[in-house]
């Protein structure tokens, strides 16, 4: 009999409601190396003290409920409960604070992002005592990290498979995203790959619709890959979207891709779900396929500053669940992404050990204990004039993906691909020569235009295009 059970047996069960903070607010608690640590941005209802709100978050996301229950006496709450161990005010906000919560590792199933999120970002987000709640960051202990396979292959293995080193990889999303027949779709893939891109991509919306069934798309894209490889002497790939309505159908598509001999498949990991994603990731490792991840639906979860979950948490979850690439914003394009915040979660995707750095939104030091890294993909509203900034911001271990910035070229898809490849090679060469891409970027692109008419035409088309709106998500 546990001490807690013994005590309750002596004094009798006392029904009723008591303040959460009496049990779940423990400012003297010393966190353990095995604890999962969470940083929540909490906005309580008027009149709810910070300690009570923070304790409520810890309780409702672990062992607690709204009233005392007699079965508390059948276990050891001290062993299993979440604890709010620190509260810190948010600068510039009157009624908002960061609540730090520690969760014992035994609360979570091994190797399951699904189970971890069911607790930590579950019903507590609808709790009436809170006006808003946002999960800003998680510290995943190395004891839990080691229960996950992680990315199917990782950055170095991908480079070795592709035999491409010393520069970012280049991609393109085929447009229009919906409506093309499989044969015309395959033609666009071929033209882009022949022009110098490393990858082309299914849009996240492309699954298996009446205008283009998945099997037809896979066949025509495989033909485009092999033909462009034969012409260029480079290894090419197309992200074949295996996302489907069931896990069984998803795996059937991945199996067909492997039988075609293509190097990479794709999954929409948030709409598809973490269970499906982890299943596909395991299949890809076992069968030599790279896995590209799209984050469709992320902004529903992460864009509001006061409620939801920050993308850095979704990025960590993806690294655990498995994926070799993931879309991570561009900083300079059409999609949301403040520079320091973006670089923060890019570090969390790629690096093995990341120190706490609040200037980048990183609340905890994270040790991935050699879990393979994920390549960030910059995609969304980018074109050749952005190439110097993208090369400088993201570095070599990245994919720079131009959809409209390739297919919108006035001379066609292949010249659009040529323009992007020339711009990239010019930026990499200039960087390697010691030139400052941030300061000299436009001059570097203009110099390259002199010996690439394709690049010159692209620069003329997009010279006025800018997406200058303030980021919603700031530190």
Swiss-Prot record:
Q: Where in the cell is it found?
A: Plastid, Chloroplast
Where on the chain is N6,N6,N6-trimethyllysine found, per UniProt?
14
Which BP terms does GO give this entry?
Answer: photorespiration; reductive pentose-phosphate cycle
User: Which parts of the sequence are marked as the site Transition state stabilizer?
Assistant: 334
Proregion residues are 1-2
UniProt: D-ribulose 1,5-bisphosphate binding residues: 175, 177, 204, 295, 327, 334, 379, 381, 403-404
Q: Which UniProt keywords apply?
A: Acetylation, Calvin cycle, Carbon dioxide fixation, Chloroplast, Disulfide bond, Lyase, Magnesium, Metal-binding, Methylation, Monooxygenase, Oxidoreductase, Photorespiration, Photosynthesis, Plastid
What EC identifiers does the entry list?
4.1.1.39
- The chain residues annotated with the modification N-acetylproline are 3
This protein's major location comes to plastid
Required cofactor(s): Mg(2+)
Picking any one GO molecular function of the record gives: ribulose-bisphosphate carboxylase activity
User: Which residues are reported to carry the modification N6-carboxylysine?
Assistant: 201
The UniProt entry annotates the active site at 175, 294
Q: Which residues does UniProt assign to the signal peptide?
A: none
What reaction does this enzyme carry out catalytically?
2 (2R)-3-phosphoglycerate + 2 H(+) = D-ribulose 1,5-bisphosphate + CO2 + H2O; D-ribulose 1,5-bisphosphate + O2 = 2-phosphoglycolate + (2R)-3-phosphoglycerate + 2 H(+)
Q: Which family does it belong to?
A: Belongs to the RuBisCO large chain family. Type I subfamily.
Tell me the function of this protein. Answer: RuBisCO catalyzes two reactions: the carboxylation of D-ribulose 1,5-bisphosphate, the primary event in carbon dioxide fixation, as well as the oxidative fragmentation of the pentose substrate in the photorespiration process. Both reactions occur simultaneously and in competition at the same active site. Binds to abscisic acid (ABA); only half of the possible binding sites are occupied in the crystal and there are indications this is a low affinity site.
Q: State whether it acts alone or in a complex, and with which partners, per the record.
A: Heterohexadecamer of 8 large chains and 8 small chains. Heterohexadecamer; disulfide-linked. The disulfide link is formed within the large subunit homodimers.
What more does the entry say? The basic functional RuBisCO is composed of a large chain homodimer in a 'head-to-tail' conformation. In form I RuBisCO this homodimer is arranged in a barrel-like tetramer with the small subunits forming a tetrameric 'cap' on each end of the 'barrel'.
For this entry, the protein name equals: Ribulose bisphosphate carboxylase large chain
Species name: Pisum sativum (Garden pea)
């Amino acid at each position: 009999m546990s001490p807690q059970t013994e005590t309750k047996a002596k004094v009798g069960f006392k029904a009723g409601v008591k303040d959460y903070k009496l049990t779940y607010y423990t400012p003297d608690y010393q966190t353990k190396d095995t604890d999962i640590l969470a940083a929540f941005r909490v906005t309580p209802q008027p009149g709810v003290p910070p300690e009570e709100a923070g304790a409520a978050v810890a309780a409702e996301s672990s062992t607690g409920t709204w009233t005392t229950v007699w079965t508390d006496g059948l276990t050891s709450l001290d062993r299993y409960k979440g604890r709010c161990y620190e509260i810190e005010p948010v600068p510039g906000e009157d009624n908002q604070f960061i609540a730090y919560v520690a969760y014992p590792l035994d609360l979570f199933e091994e190797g399951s992002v699904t189970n971890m999120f069911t607790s930590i970002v579950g019903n507590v987000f609808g709790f009436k005592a809170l006006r808003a709640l946002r999960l800003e960051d998680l510290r995943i202990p190395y004891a839990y990290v080691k229960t996950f396979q992680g990315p199917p292959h990782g950055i170095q293995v991908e480079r070795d498979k592709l035999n491409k080193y010393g520069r970012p990889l280049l991609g393109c999303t085929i447009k229009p995203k919906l409506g093309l027949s499989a044969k015309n779709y395959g033609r666009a893939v071929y033209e882009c790959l022949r022009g110098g891109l490393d990858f082309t991509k299914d849009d996240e919306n492309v699954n298996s619709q009446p205008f283009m069934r998945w099997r037809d798309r896979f066949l025509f894209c495989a033909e485009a890959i092999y033909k462009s490889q034969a012409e260029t002497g480079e290894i090419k790939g197309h992200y074949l979207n295996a996302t489907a309505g069931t896990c069984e159908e998803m795996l059937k598509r991945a199996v067909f891709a492997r039988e075609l001999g293509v190097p990479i498949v794709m999954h929409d990991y948030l709409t598809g779900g973490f269970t499906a994603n982890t299943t596909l990731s395991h299949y890809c490792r076992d069968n030599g396929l790279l896995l590209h991840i799209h984050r469709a639906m992320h902004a529903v979860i992460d864009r509001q500053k006061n409620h939801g979950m920050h993308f850095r948490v979704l990025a960590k979850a993806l690294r655990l669940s498995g994926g070799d690439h993931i879309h991570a914003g561009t900083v300079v394009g059409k999609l949301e992404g403040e520079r320091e915040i973006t670089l923060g979660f890019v570090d969390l995707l790629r690096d093995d050990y990341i120190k706490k750095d609040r200037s980048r939104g990183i609340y905890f030091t994270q040790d991935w204990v050699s879990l393979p890294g994920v390549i960030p993909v910059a995609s969304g509203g980018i074109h050749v004039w952005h190439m110097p900034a993208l090369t400088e911001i993201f570095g070599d271990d990245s994919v720079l993906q131009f959809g409209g910035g390739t297919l919108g070229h006035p001379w066609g898809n292949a010249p659009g691909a040529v323009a992007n490849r020339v711009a990239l090679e010019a930026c990499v060469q200039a960087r390697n020569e010691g030139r400052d891409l941030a300061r000299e970027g436009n001059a570097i692109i203009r110099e390259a235009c002199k010996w690439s008419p394709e690049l010159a035409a692209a620069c003329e088309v997009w010279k006025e295009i800018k997406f200058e709106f303030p980021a919603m998500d700031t530190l």
